[in-house]
């Protein structure tokens, strides 16, 4: 087994009407928790790391862990660079073995976003690395990324069509009303906008900010063409909440083999639910 490009996973998902879950990782325990469930449920998976992730644990260490677990669990997996903003940073990580990258130029005007994404696509495609980009701007907070409500805006379908044609990007993250983090007010997803984007864009579509989104809403986006669903905040909350509860019951506890496993088990329940919502159970061939 090996680390593969997300292109192959997403093409199959698009052809067969399901979505591939993309879970953000932070350390060995989070990687292991996610893959234990994906292996059991035979679900394809994308392990996503933000620039902050790779400051906490070196890319080479994460890559080695993922490669080892791919063999242990007998399943291919994709290691994905989430919300990266620099071609030089992506170039270095691709040369180290990563085969999936998101270049986030959504904070730039359209022409500058196109120029940046096209430069990344040209390089990555020469290395069999797939590229995701974002058009529109999600609000909220994820790791070191913070976007206030005034700076957020939704994806225009016709601009999305032009963007994909001009850049050659492999998948497109669309802004349709979700946000990074948890929701402080009523969530309103623009399903009609998503349907209009799907009509004019033929590459796989990506839903960012899927934490705290009702399951039926996520399923509806998949019906309308989303093939990659990103989950981050819910995983961290489950892990941290379980560890806090363990220490509340075991104030003298100090053995990470116990409290880390409690956190992992809580995270696994979130992973299990998201796989079911994505419809990706048994989508890995034996």
From Swiss-Prot:
Highest taxon of source: Bacteria
GO MF term (any one): tagatose-bisphosphate aldolase activity
Matching HAMAP family: TagBP_aldolase_KbaY
Record field: catalytic activity: D-tagatofuranose 1,6-bisphosphate = D-glyceraldehyde 3-phosphate + dihydroxyacetone phosphate
Assigned keywords, A-Z: Lyase, Metal-binding, Zinc
SUPFAM superfamilies, sorted: Aldolase
Names of the cofactor(s): Zn(2+)
Binding site for dihydroxyacetone phosphate: 181, 209-211, 230-233
InterPro entries: Aldolase_TIM, Class_II_FBP_aldolase, FBA_II, TagBP_ald_KbaY, TagBP_ald_KbaY/GatY
Gene Ontology process terms (BP): carbohydrate metabolic process; D-tagatose 6-phosphate catabolic process
UniProt-recorded name of the protein: D-tagatose-1,6-bisphosphate aldolase subunit KbaY
Keyword Lyase carried by entry: yes
Assigned EC number: 4.1.2.40
Lineage: Bacteria, Pseudomonadati, Pseudomonadota, Gammaproteobacteria, Enterobacterales
Annotated source species: Escherichia fergusonii (strain ATCC 35469 / DSM 13698 / CCUG 18766 / IAM 14443 / JCM 21226 / LMG 7866 / NBRC 102419 / NCTC 12128 / CDC 0568-73)
Gene designation: kbaY
A Gene Ontology cellular-component term: cytosol
Note accompanying the cofactor annotation: Binds 1 zinc ion per subunit.
Role, per record: Catalytic subunit of the tagatose-1,6-bisphosphate aldolase KbaYZ, which catalyzes the reversible aldol condensation of dihydroxyacetone phosphate (DHAP or glycerone-phosphate) with glyceraldehyde 3-phosphate (G3P) to produce tagatose 1,6-bisphosphate (TBP). Requires KbaZ subunit for full activity and stability.
Family of the protein in this entry: Belongs to the class II fructose-bisphosphate aldolase family. TagBP aldolase KbaY subfamily.
Active site: 82
Binding site for Zn(2+): 83, 180, 208
Involved pathway(s): Carbohydrate metabolism; D-tagatose 6-phosphate degradation; D-glyceraldehyde 3-phosphate and glycerone phosphate from D-tagatose 6-phosphate: step 2/2
């Amino acid at each position: 087994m090996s680390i593969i490009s997300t292109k192959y996973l997403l093409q199959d998902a698009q052809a067969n009407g399901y979505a591939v879950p993309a879970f953000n990782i932070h350390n060995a325990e989070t990687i292991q928790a996610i893959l234990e469930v994906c292996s059991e449920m035979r679900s394809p998976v994308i392990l996503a790391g933000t620039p902050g992730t790779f400051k906490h644990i070196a890319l080479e260490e994460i890559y080695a862990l993922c490669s080892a677990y791919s063999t242990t669990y007998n399943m291919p997996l994709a290691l994905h660079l989430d919300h990266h903003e620099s071609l030089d940073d992506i170039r270095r990580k691709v040369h180290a073995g990563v085969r999936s990258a998101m270049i986030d130029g959504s904070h730039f005007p359209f022409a500058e976003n196109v120029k940046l994404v096209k430069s990344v696509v040209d390089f990555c495609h020469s290395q069999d690395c797939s590229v995701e980009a974002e058009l529109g701007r999600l609000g909220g907070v994820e790791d070191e990324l913070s976007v206030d409500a005034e700076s957020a805006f939704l994806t225009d379908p016709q601009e999305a069509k032009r963007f994909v044609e001009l850049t050659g990007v492999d998948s497109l993250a669309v802004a349709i009303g979700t946000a990074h983090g948890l929701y402080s007010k009523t969530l309103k997803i623009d399903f009609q906008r998503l349907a209009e984007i799907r009509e004019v864009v033929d590459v796989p579509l990506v839903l960012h900010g899927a934490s705290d989104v009702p399951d039926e809403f996520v399923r509806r986006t998949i019906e309308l063409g989303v093939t990659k669903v990103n989950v981050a905040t819910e995983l961290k909350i489950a892990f941290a909440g379980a560890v806090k509860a363990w220490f509340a019951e075991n104030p003298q506890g100090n053995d990470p083999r116990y409290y880390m496993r409690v956190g992992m088990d809580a995270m696994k329940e979130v992973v299990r639910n998201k796989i079911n919502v994505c419809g990706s159970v048994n989508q890995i061939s034996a």
